[in-house]
């Protein structure tokens, strides 16, 4: 069986191992191997869909990336226990120190995997930031504006996407 072969999805402990392997491959920039692991895992949740989307984005398959991110956002809002990031509950008062907030706002989109333990608000932010990037490449400029507004216009990389649109 080769890469992206016709292996059926794997359930149980092996599914968890495939997810973990996919995360490791993302960290190494091995996008094809990571994508294959996530496809073969039987996970149908927001972290898996986001991680697949990140692999698609990095290989310039923007249409599929965008589709997977829409599904990840929908799964994130699903009922607890079915396709969402259980992680730490959302805490609107939770704020990192100022230095971290500045760094985050000024940084490019992180190319990191989404883990099941990620707090819901942080997961949604990662999903939306990547979705804005994919929408920009698909020339869906109104969606980029909408996402930037949803995120409070606080990310410099989104401002940079909006500059050529608004000219």
Per-segment meaning from a language model:
Residues 6-8, 38, 77-92, 97-121:
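Flexible helix-coil transition and linker loops at the boundaries of alpha-helical arrays
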Residues 8-40, 130:
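Alpha-helical segment of the N-proximal tetratricopeptide repeat
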Residues 13, 44, 116-119, 123:
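Structural signature of alpha-solenoid helical repeat junctions
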Residues 13-16, 20, 51, 58, ...:
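"A position-specific structural signal for the A-helix of alpha-solenoid helical repeats
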Residues 31, 38, 69-72, 76, ...:
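Inward-facing hydrophobic residues that define packing positions of alpha-helical scaffold repeats
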Residues 46-51, 75-88, 153-165:
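Boundary/linker segments of alpha-helical solenoid repeat arrays
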